[in-house]
């Protein structure tokens, strides 16, 4: 049996946290899934058995920070699954970890390996808590305590940049740096330190997620129209990019999965 819940953060945390999701699965046999880059970092707590990342032949840590990803991962269950995940707004994760999040790119960094006693204590308490509601309350209390130390002055400008990327199929570094009121060099550095990847790569990930969203809501759309709506140069460009991020062409992907955009849906 599988249950999946999306939980919205309290209003005060919404500028920093997109949502929480909780997955429980006691299905007999191995459950496997291919995950694609979402453009958002996350904080993951396993209360059940850990997942195995099969294409890297490694087990996920018990609790970990998932950095920005540049490609797909194949994950498989090793027993009963019980996961609680906090998904950050693209520009907000650095507030809670006090490090340049570029260091976390393409990595699952165990909470146990981070010099942050409060975060390690949170992981233990989430693991031992009676129910999911208590877990979410503990996680939100931790986030509130982090925010007591203030937020970076450039956070609003990065939020505006992300909003522009979300709403535009065509933009460039110069336009984004102008929105942020920074030089292109300053902008690229601050963007990467706070979002965990370069502006160019982030825009490519958002374009991938937009492609999934259009496919999700327009079953049977032609690939030429899809590439036009999502801002690719042409159909061959879209197919190349999609395969780079997912391991499949769009046609191969929809033959295996129902396309869903985590970024634009939740």
Tell what function each PLM region has.
Residues 1-159, 163-174, 180-184, 198, ...:
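Alpha-helical bundle regulatory/interaction domains
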Residues 160-161, 207-210:
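Pre-recognition alpha-helix immediately N-terminal to the DNA-recognition helix
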Residues 188-193, 197-203:
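Long, low-complexity intrinsically disordered regions
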Residues 194-197, 240-253:
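A secondary-structure capping/hinge motif
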Residues 203-204, 254-255:
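Short Lys/Arg-enriched helix C-cap and helix-to-coil transition segments
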């Amino acid at each position: 049996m599988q249950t999946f819940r999306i939980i919205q953060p309290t209003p005060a945390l919404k500028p920093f946290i997109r949502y929480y999701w909780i997955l429980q699965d006691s299905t007999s046999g191995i459950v496997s899934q291919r995950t694609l880059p979402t453009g958002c970092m996350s904080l993951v707590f396993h209360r059940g058995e850990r997942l195995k990342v099969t294409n890297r032949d490694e087990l996920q840590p018990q609790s970990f920070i998932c950095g920005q990803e540049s490609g797909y991962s194949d994950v498989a269950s090793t027993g009963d699954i019980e996961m609680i995940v906090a998904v950050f707004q693209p520009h907000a994760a650095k507030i809670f970890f006090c490090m340049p999040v570029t260091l976390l790119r393409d990595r699952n960094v165990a909470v146990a390996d981070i010099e942050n006693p409060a975060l390690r204590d949170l992981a233990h308490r989430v693991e031992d808590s009676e129910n999911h509601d208590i877990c979410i309350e503990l996680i939100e209390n931790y986030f509130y305590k982090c925010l007591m130390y203030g937020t970076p002055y450039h956070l609003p400008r990065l939020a505006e940049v992300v909003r522009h990327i979300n709403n535009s199929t065509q933009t460039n570094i110069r336009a984004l740096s102008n929105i942020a009121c920074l030089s292109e060099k300053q902008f690229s550095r601050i963007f990467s330190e706070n979002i965990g990847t370069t502006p160019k790569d982030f825009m490519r990930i958002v374009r991938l997620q937009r492609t999934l969203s259009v496919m999700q809501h327009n079953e049977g759309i032609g690939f030429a129209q899809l590439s036009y709506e999502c801002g690719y140069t042409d159909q061959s460009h879209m197919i190349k990019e999609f395969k780079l991020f997912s391991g499949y062409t769009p046609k191969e992907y929809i033959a295996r999965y129902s396309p869903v955009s985590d970024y634009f849906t939740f």
